[in-house]
């Protein structure tokens, strides 16, 4: 689950991490009121969307010369003007795609006199099974270009979670940032605080960009992104309440209500599979046969008729879907139960695209009989390769 910048900063502040004063706003009036509570005379007005590149982004509804989603304001009047331009308009960044995201929230913060900018992030390094701490002296809006053009300026420090954060990790961070004296000590302390927050909150990613050194010699978190492991939200009810569903794909939100793991993709073949590994293999073989998957959808090990029906409805809400491939291995789940769900769902949604079903496992023959006697134009498949070839052929024939 992704958090907005102001939400992430609210959480980090609880760990004693230095954060510039700021206030979230849903309206122009709230933005102005928030700015009046800050020392000034400089303010920063930030669009709050779940995407990076806001500073270099452009608003669809504004002219090409308009400012982006992060703006410096030199007065309360400037704050008001920026808030009026940003709220309700669509911000397009390198991470949103051409469709952009509508700005519904702002974050007004106090301006900071910046001496230097750095980059510091933490991610789950799945290859090593450790936490990867990524550090660079080249923080700011161009960090992606730095990673591409001068990767030697980026240092990665791995931390074994079984061992935890050790003093030498903090020293390594400070050394990578080329800090000395009091700033060196601040960096070591900050690295430990961030690691503690990362582990306590079950983060998948925590990015500080930029981490800034102020003119008076303080390290402050100027901007941050935070992503929480959705499977751990039951441990963080306060964090779960921060979820902003308006920033998420509506189909993915609906799928989560039925405990379906759904991710929309750009292809034309809808997929309904049980098990993440089998789902990925199914998508791979669809591509191998010259088509592209329209989604990842894992119905899990306890699919019911209700869940299968919901899955079909979610898949068919995507106008790009031209056919559906169902690939089920019945272990805990019985194939006859799945077949009954498929028949009920196909009739309820008035399926009008080709449907290929491959069943294997417990009660597979009963499942195949149910499909064969359903009176629906369901195409059976014997194995994964056969299923992929058939759905691609059916879609081409129906085109």
From Swiss-Prot:
Cofactor dependency: Mg(2+)
Domain ATP-grasp, residue spans: 9-254
Catalytic activity, EC: 6.2.1.5
Residues engaged in binding substrate: 274, 331-333
Catalytic reaction list: succinate + ATP + CoA = succinyl-CoA + ADP + phosphate; GTP + succinate + CoA = succinyl-CoA + GDP + phosphate
Keywords annotated in UniProt: ATP-binding, Ligase, Magnesium, Metal-binding, Nucleotide-binding, Tricarboxylic acid cycle
Function recorded in the entry: Succinyl-CoA synthetase functions in the citric acid cycle (TCA), coupling the hydrolysis of succinyl-CoA to the synthesis of either ATP or GTP and thus represents the only step of substrate-level phosphorylation in the TCA. The beta subunit provides nucleotide specificity of the enzyme and binds the substrate succinate, while the binding sites for coenzyme A and phosphate are found in the alpha subunit.
Protein name: Succinate--CoA ligase [ADP-forming] subunit beta
Gene name of this polypeptide: sucC
